[in-house]
């Protein structure tokens, strides 16, 4: 009964003490928030430009990802996955969501993979 009551109070997404401390500090640090927003927006713009350069103009996105809407998205999803680049695939409409690469090595891998992608043969 006690554990059940506690679980009902806390809910399924509890946050431990150290994480709460870090989160509270981050929420108070306005300069860090501004810098993080600027960094994310710059990275998102970089991703948009990279995709456009390879013939994949984004159909929208946010500071955290870019979205592609194209009939070839399923093939691109599989191709990137085989190269260790994970994307989020949607079927209707055929689309992909690509998150921001984590570091320069990941940016280079994505660039090389997009360069090597060949459109699937049509039946």
Model-derived features with residue positions:
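Residues that cap or initiate secondary-structure elements
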Residues: 2, 72-74, 104
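PLP-dependent enzyme catalytic core of the Aspartate aminotransferase-like
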Residues: 79-83, 90-123
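Residues at alpha-helix caps and immediate loop-helix transition turns in enzyme cores, especially N-
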Residues: 19, 32, 72, 106-110
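A short, ordered amphipathic alpha-helix with a cationic face
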Residues: 11-12, 82-85
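Conserved PLP-binding catalytic core of the aspartate aminotransferase-like
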Residues: 41, 48-83, 96, 100
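PLP-dependent aminotransferase class I/II
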Residues: 1-51, 56-57
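Short, flexible turn/loop "capping" segments at secondary-structure junctions
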Residues: 58-59, 89-91
């Amino acid at each position: 009964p006690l554990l059940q009551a506690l679980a009902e109070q806390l809910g399924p997404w509890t946050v431990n003490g150290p994480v709460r401390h870090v989160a509270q500090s981050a929420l108070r640090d306005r300069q860090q928030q501004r810098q993080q927003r600027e960094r994310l927006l710059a990275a998102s713009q970089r991703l948009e430009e990279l995709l456009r350069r390879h013939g994949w103009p984004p159909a929208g996105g946010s500071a955290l990802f870019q979205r592609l809407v194209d009939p070839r998205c399923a093939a691109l999803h599989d191709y990137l996955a085989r190269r260790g680049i994970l994307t989020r695939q949607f079927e209707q409409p055929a689309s992909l969501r690509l998150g921001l690469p984590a570091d320069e090595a990941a940016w280079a891998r994505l660039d090389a993979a997009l360069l090597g992608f060949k459109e699937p043969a049509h039946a």
